Amino acid sequence: MSTDKKFIYRRILLKISGEVLQGVNKFGIDINSLKRIAKEIEFIVKIGVQVGLVIGSGNLFRGAKLSKLGLNRVASDHIGILSTVINSLAMRDTINSISSIKTCLMSAIPLNGICEIYNYEKAMNLLSNHVVVIFSAGTGNPFFTTDSAACLRGIETESDIILKGTKVDGVYSKDPNKDSHAFLYRRLTYKDVLKKELKIMDLAAFTLARDYHMPIRVFNIHTPGSLYRIIMGDDEGTLITR
């Protein structure tokens, strides 16, 4: 990967879905997936990009799914919240083990001895000093997704864009696994997404991004070098703006 060009984003909020971490497994964490993503993060930090990180919990437990199985919704969401902490701990340890860049794991709920409580001023200071800040435990509240947490932290930390790393190449007109005529959108407006009822993220999260004019790019983080290319201005995945 060449560093001749200058990156176009000073600070990003990277949202990674939990499913990305499970690799080819049906459940849990795949160490090879962790290492590959950690290396991509390390590379962009070393060229000067500031990175905030939010990780989902779909590889472990989703609150909404657990509630459908009969658990209380609040308890289900608390299990999902704790699952994000597990994923975040794994990512922090992986980054620390393969690179020299610094990390800080913050939680929206108190978890003494495991990670520190989220603090806005400290997070801003750390990001400015090129420390990767991992925001875990979602918003700390039930009924809110990690997409909502990503939008919230992205707006709070004045990120230039939310980059949503998934297992697919971007936003499609329909599910490409079910419809051979589905096509990939390269650019969309917030209005387009709402009108077409495209499932980019939940409505609460998406509305928050729209109201604060926070651009979102959905891309396939499994594609080698995709994160770096986006940072350098390549039109990879799908960009959503006003």
From Swiss-Prot:
Organism superkingdom: Bacteria
Catalytic activity, as annotated: UMP + ATP = UDP + ADP
Class of this enzyme: transferase
Pfam families: AA_kinase
Positions with a binding annotation for ATP: K15, I16, S17, G18, G58, R62, T166, Y172, D175
GO process annotations (BP): 'de novo' CTP biosynthetic process; UDP biosynthetic process
Keyword Nuclease: no
Annotated positions binding UMP: D77, T139, G140, N141, P142, F143, F144, T145, T146
Pathway field: Pyrimidine metabolism; CTP biosynthesis via de novo pathway; UDP from UMP (UMPK route): step 1/1
Protein's cellular compartments: Cytoplasm
Annotated disulfide bonds: none
Subunit structure: Homohexamer.
Family: Belongs to the UMP kinase family.
Protein name per the record: Uridylate kinase
Organism whose genome encodes this protein: Buchnera aphidicola subsp. Acyrthosiphon pisum (strain APS) (Acyrthosiphon pisum symbiotic bacterium)
Primary gene name: pyrH
